[in-house]
Amino acid sequence: MNYLKDNFVCGTKDITDEPYCGMSGRHEVWGNAVNTTNGAGPHNIQIFVLNPDGTVLHCLPGYWNSEDLITELDFAKRVNQLYMTTGSIEAKKQQFVQMHMAHIKQHSPAMVQRSHMQGFDQMYEAKKRLETTDTIANMAAVKNALATKGHIPDSAFKTTDVIMHERDAKQPFVPYDQFNVVAFSDYGKTKYDKNEDYHNVYGRVDMQAARNAPEIGINKDAQKTTANSNQPLSYKDYLRRHGIR
């Protein structure tokens, strides 16, 4: 918090009605917080770092570990230094791309480990968007696993830190109101929720309480299940509703 206070002016925007918004439970600012993987829930949260004139220096999709967030914010400060230099905007845009792509190799092994895509998001990309996704690192491995109904290795997918910088590099020094958030945040399922406020003393989700929890956003992947009826949810129905395999 001190890092943010000392280096940035922070604000939030409600994206509930935006076309790129995903879906999750409603979590108040005083609610519980839990750990998850970098880049989880990209449709629900986007962390923008802007120059005071509104130009996008960096954008991070979804949740980020605090240590890794500071790494990326430090990087954004260097991108801002580039933006503030004299010279043609075209030359600076080329450097923007180079900086974002080069920073991928500067990520620590621990950060990369924290940036593996959620398993249900990997399956969504492989089964629903195989021919269009940019999230797969080894297409042959994915296609072979799908054809043989085998396990898709985690290494067949790009980590979210790579996806982030590659997508940022496609929009160099774009004004905030022109940034294509739809394209940037579009990977995995649109619903992501860890039910932070419904964890019991054992660290497990209270399924009965979570079932009736208020939700916000639009679940574009939703299918009709017993969750749409008045029948009690089974354990499998609950997991399916929350995108958990």
Predicted regions and their residues:
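Non-globular targeting/processing and membrane-anchoring segments
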Residues: 68-245
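A short acidic/small-residue loop/turn micro-motif
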Residues: 63-65
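Thioredoxin-like thiol-disulfide oxidoreductase module
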Residues: 1-58, 74-76, 151, 155-173, ...
